[in-house]
Design a protein with these regions (language model features):
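Bacterial N-terminal signal peptides that target proteins for export
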Residues: 1-9
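Hydrophobic h-region of N-terminal signal peptides that target proteins for export
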Residues: 13-21
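Asparagine/serine/threonine-enriched low-complexity, disordered tracts
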Residues: 252-260
Length: 261
């Protein structure tokens, strides 16, 4: 999920070294999945899952300041669609209904990527888990690749946590993606309890997360999440507008479903 970071080609030697480093790197990668009753709506206060909501991000301020060469834009849409993902949990096979969240990225108006991400809320902890993503990379209007795509339950991939419920402790470390050789993004809590201002407004009760991956150790990203809103900053991208259009029956979780096959 690190923006603009897609693994195109990694040598066998690098992959072996990365796998070894991931074995015991101080980041939690095993989670109490068996105790979860997964649902596809709700989320938590720092990562809401609200079908019909769309958030728009831009680095226009960075461009205007002369610090960025290209205008990058990102639309995150929490779809009404769900996806059923079957995977082994706690010694048995379970099917989890996940929320589809689409990310659409452009650079200077040209489409560069569309990804469909799959999240579910663990009840009663309200930790939001990440179950994978389908990725389309674009060039000149055509799909040219699917780098970094993964799905829990396939090829040894397991869910990671994208955002824990309010148990945000500075210094906490955990894996967001657990897909060997493909996606091994990690999160570390850096600071909390501050306010931030972006084009969409001023937000309180914010927290900062640093993201890294053993596959590309020099790539470091920073995200800011604010209570009641979710992602507000993604490196130089800033939340610019929120479009909310939920249906009254969204909480019934009767959306159209897509199987994992």
């Amino acid at each position: 999920m690190i923006r603009a970071t897609k693994l195109a080609a990694v040598s066998a030697l690098v992959l072996v070294a990365a796998a070894a480093a991931a074995q015991d790197d101080g980041f939690t990668k095993k989670f109490p999945l068996a105790s979860c009753q997964f649902i596809s709506v709700g989320g938590n206060r720092y990562f809401p899952l609200i079908p019909g909501r769309q958030l728009y991000y831009s680095n226009a301020a960075c461009v205007a300041a002369g610090k960025c060469d290209a205008l990058n834009e990102l639309w995150i849409t929490e779809e009404r669609e769900t996806k059923r993902i079957t995977l082994p949990i706690g010694g048995t096979t379970r099917t989890v209904v996940t929320r589809v969240v689409q990310e659409r990225e452009t650079e200077d108006g040209e489409l560069v990527e569309i990804s469909r991400n799959y999240f579910a809320n663990c009840w009663p902890s309200r930790d939001v888990y990440y179950f994978g993503e389908d990725v389309d990379i674009y060039k000149n209007g055509k799909v040219v690749g699917h780098e970094s795509a993964w799905l829990a339950g396939r090829h040894g991939a397991r869910p990671g946590i994208v955002m824990p419920e309010d148990g945000f402790i500075t210094g906490s470390r955990y894996y967001q993606e657990v897909a060997p050789d493909v996606a091994l993004d990690r999160a570390e809590h850096k600071r909390t309890g501050f306010a931030t201002r972006v084009p969409a407004g001023r937000f309180d009760n914010c927290l900062e997360v640093e993201e890294t991956t053993v596959l590309e150790p020099d790539d470091i990203g920073h995200k800011t999440y604010c209570r009641g809103v979710g992602l507000v900053k993604d490196d130089d991208l800033e939340l610019t507008a929120i479009y909310a259009n939920p249906r009254p029956d969204d909480d019934n979780d009767n959306d159209n479903e897509d199987d994992d096959d």
